[in-house]
Amino acid sequence: MSSIARPPDPCLVAVVLIARSRAGPRFVFHYPPRPLADNALRPPKARRTSRSRSRQNSKGNDSTSSDDSHSSSDEDEEEAPSQNLNNSNNSNNNSYIAGSRRSSNFGLDDSNTLSENQRPGSISSSRAYLRKRGANSDAETDSGVGSDRQEDGSRESDGPNRVPWESILGLPVDVWEKLLSPSRSWHKRRFELGINDLAFVGWPVFVREDGNWRKQRRKKKKKQRAEWESGELGHNDATEDSQDDGNDAVAASTETLSPFSALHPISQRPSVPNSRSSQMSSEPLDADDKDMMTMFNVVFVLDPPLLEYSMRVREIYDNVIKKFSKALKWEQSRTNYVWRECQHILNIKEKAKEKRSSLNSLYADIISQSSLARAIRTLYTSISASKIASVTLSPDVSISLQIPPLTSTPYLPGPTDQAYPGLWLTTADSISPADDPMTDDNSAPHQVLAKHFALLLLDNEATIIKDVEAAGGALAPPLVHYIRCSSPTKSFVQISQISGMPLPTIQFLASHLVYWRRARAIPPLHQRDTYIVSPNCDLSKLEVASAAYKVAFPTLPSLPKMLSALSGTPRPYGNFIPSKDHKATYFLILAWLLRGGWVTQLRSFARVKVSPEIKMAVELAIRREEVDKYLSKGKPPVATSDKEDSVNDERTEGSDFDDASSSSSSSLASHGSGDATPMPNRFRADTGVDLTHSLLDQTASLKTSSLILLPHKVSPLESRWLDEIVARFPDNAPDFVGNTTEVDSATPIPAKSLKEVWPTYLKYFNGYDALEKIPVREGLKRKLVSQVLTRLGLVTGQSSTELDPREQVLVSFRHW
């Protein structure tokens, strides 16, 4: 599998709604009407055909059902009985007799006819398997496994007369009713079932034993907090999962269910008090109702590629399946919404069956009359197209769902990788690093943006503000204020200082805009930084982009001219700015180019080089220390007892064995235990000097240079190398004047000794952190940083001051 990051690919085939009442499970609705036919025009992908072939004669388990590691605890744990991980709704081993097809890309077909050379998928985790039938047999349920629901039997007996909506993916719906109706042990857990090349993933929700869909809690007075503080981002469920379904938690979850989206204004959003009052006014369901719903399960049918299976299933489960099911659960607890819609859909299907309506006519009626069916259709069409799905369940509940798109990639696609032209090419990570003091250890990953990044709006500022104001809500005023204050040239910290807004609030608002595809977090734009034409830019859109560029900047150089200039020898962006009066306009051009993926920042990286001279000096110093340590003991060099001689002989033999078999490394772990590290050519016992505890790495060559990979996690030997490097720095440094350009002043700046600034810079010489981070994170002048790096060996061009070879200790390279 290639290491290239890929954009969202939901691989969504269908969405299925299963409901179970006291009478038994019911297959309520699925979309699209013909999943295989509607997905037949999809681009071919590397599907899991190899696994299907390898399992053709195997009776192994084809399905997986795993517990959700983030299973919600917002209801009593005593709801679930003993954990019987059998995802069948019957305790006996049930056998389903069903058709099998291999003519489609998914390994399934809408045909109900069978052929003897085709195999069924095995479903052992549900205590079921699909058995072959003759070529003229119809797929129907085995007589030993009937539905819990007593019906007229028409669905089992009238195979040739079965209506088209009573079969999906080549199997009758009564088979799917049992397969997709797990036991109560799967309550609010990740339910996953594999059949052939398809994965069925859901988040089943069961009613409580008292007939309610949530735990009734007494009201608790809590400090009121702003509406947007309760998880409106829609992508942080960590706090919600750890809360009970009390009134306050429901109010908080309402805000998550109805996120303020700058993209899709949602009307009729309820306030928190309204949500609470409507929820408290709902009456508990009658436990004696013979037809009350006891479980519902929204199942997403996926067809992910084999090598990306886990990643694709996880992203759609975390971002769509779980959140949509939570929204339905909340609305079911308030108004019995899900069961009411299920009954309505089933009634429409019964009437259509009596009238012998066509499939298209039936679906037109269902979607026009059922808000839940419309929500499922919207969810399918939007998520399958990697768009944001804005779903309205009722006038009081709306929810926006999406799989967060990939905004950048650090890799260029290889010969066998699918190319995504126009994707931002960069290694810059906008997420707070682990050593950032502003990072919250308890926060979910990928939530906190690094405080030294800036915000680049992906649309016109006026357009975004207009959408935000139209949507309204408590989040609108701070969002509008932040959008007006933000600038791609100012970091979040700088915006906080200028606007007076708290830094965590700015990071939250910026994360909100990034999540809802309205902005992108980038390193702040600066005239001293270097920008080049992105190797991943989409030149097929050059003509269209040139027209848009001309409208935005009619009096400035055209887009082809700007790209041509940036394609030359890399140099600071300030060299392209004609004068100070053009500075703001040229930054707008740079932001426009970055927004479209036309350019990327060329960044510098470096590692510390250890020369053979440094290595030899350290080795001699260590040898000298060992000799001095031995002589300081004041013991006779040879006068030892027989017992001591025996011990020394054993130590010598063991050390010789280590010399031949071990290869010590310069990592911290290899020296942290205090074990002896043998050194070749050490003094023998007859001289009385034993240097077995030397720090020297016997595998390191003294004739070649070495690189220190992690300066902040060095081994003892590497630490001695660094100390020797610093010791050789000159104490006094002359005034230094760097490159002079139109935007750089040639005024000399008094340079400090490198011994003083070395600890500040050293941690960035790991080959991963761009050197452009140093002035931003350390609060230093960029020109001063450039001078220090030039003295240390960073190649930046001709210098007006002769460089000292003792200070040239860096090996630098540049990329995006």
Curated annotation (Swiss-Prot):
Residues 26-166, 213-249, 262-287, 632-684 are annotated as: Disordered. Residues 101-127, 268-282 have a biased composition (Polar residues). InterPro entries: HTH_NPRL3 (IPR056603), Npr3 (IPR005365). GO terms for cellular component: GATOR1 complex. Residues 44-56, 214-224 have a biased composition (Basic residues). Pfam families: HTH_NPRL3, NPR3. Mediates inactivation of the TORC1 complex in response to amino acid starvation. Required for meiotic nuclear division. This is Nitrogen permease regulator 3. Keywords: Meiosis, Signal. GO terms for biological process: cellular response to amino acid starvation; meiotic cell cycle; negative regulation of TORC1 signaling; positive regulation of autophagy.
